[in-house]
């Protein structure tokens, strides 16, 4: 195999691996590139390698995606193989038969590979919106903010982080595993989200026992119920956060106003220096960020856009327009 062909196959394998483990939509996979590779004599070897990096991946074997997702993926993989004149691959059909005998669950798993070789695995609802909340799944801005954090660990290392609207927990778990914060406070307000969030924290090897990290090198991790409309200044002050983050929480006008209210309280209640604040959001319409910026300006909170980062670790929609704003809160009690 020519060097460029080997490089292309490696890139293709990585794309299939990352997308499958994260259970991304099947149309987003590089099927056309696979079709071209299957014309080569080594096409069957590539398919077997894809099988090992997806359905047979150790992470997937332990915490796989939904049964329906795995079935559809294997069916499409088999169809691509059958479209070329070559011998059948028993391994593909055996894998499909095994999946067909597996019972479906209301929960599925998505896993995201980190540069260290570690991974973050989330248990998520098989429905996009369930129990009346959008917090049970991972949205693209959470992935984008996690990538930025991994590329800029100094912003989080040995610091206390408060995350507003943690949802399924992807961003925080990635930061805890890759950036070594002193402490990390996940927060949300919906009971179903908090239940799943606690489960995901435990699933990834962290302890929720106060002051009892799993080992000497672990961060102290807590999960807090935080209603933005009811939280008090004293509650926020008790967290003593050095950094505050939020991702994909600007999905309606009311939430935007509530978030700015919390940010103003954080600005007013700090005993010493105000925390660094990073808010990531996907621009779904012209109004998505416009209202937030208008409210920040009205509240006197300075903001600046963080330059786009270069490393793309996680599979999310290429066309997604995602922004990270760094907010500067001026502590009234600063030194």
UniProtKB/Swiss-Prot annotation:
Alphabetized GO MF terms: protein-lysine N-methyltransferase activity
This enzyme's EC code(s): 2.1.1.-
Alphabetized UniProt keyword annotations: Acetylation, Cytoplasm, Methyltransferase, S-adenosyl-L-methionine, Transferase
Domain of life from the UniProt record: Eukaryota
GO biological process: peptidyl-lysine trimethylation
Enzyme class: transferase
Location within or outside the cell: Cytoplasm
GO cellular component: cytoplasm
Catalytic activity, as annotated: L-lysyl-[protein] + 3 S-adenosyl-L-methionine = N(6),N(6),N(6)-trimethyl-L-lysyl-[protein] + 3 S-adenosyl-L-homocysteine + 3 H(+)
Binding, S-adenosyl-L-methionine: 139, 165-167, 228, 247
Signal peptide: none
Chain positions with N-acetylmethionine modification: 1
Protein's job: Catalyzes the trimethylation of eukaryotic elongation factor 2 (EEF2) on 'Lys-525'.
Similarity annotation: Belongs to the class I-like SAM-binding methyltransferase superfamily. EEF2KMT family.
Subunit structure of this chain's protein: Interacts with FAM86B2 and FAM86C1P.
Protein name according to UniProt: Protein-lysine N-methyltransferase EEF2KMT
